[in-house]
């Protein structure tokens, strides 16, 4: 093979590999609501210390159980640049999201799922209170088995 052709092929191959490696490094972020997202993961029921002291279940605090969606790959969540409303804090490496379930029909959907693997549709929002147990939560619109 001609040395010039070999150099050209090696150069093109290095460009292709460089392009793919930057794709893996640059993770596209999901956005906080009002846009809906769909995430799949495993449901975890985790107890946290609740009232009266929010310090230790072993020392008498009531357990406060949160429903957590554990996703297989970390995501980043960014503000929606087209919206003046909502959360402004960038979060990266998010692997767990607390489920925010606001209606009886959604609770019924959750009870109807007989698998720990879920497919959740909802709007992302940032934690704003002590009752929010993960950095990013999902306001649930729909729950299905994954």
Tell where the protein language model's regions lie, with residue ranges.
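Bacterial N-terminal signal peptides that target proteins for export
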Residues: 2-10
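Short nucleic-acid-contacting surface segments enriched for D/E, G, S/T with interspersed K/R
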Residues: 105-120
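Bacterial N-terminal signal peptides
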Residues: 9-18
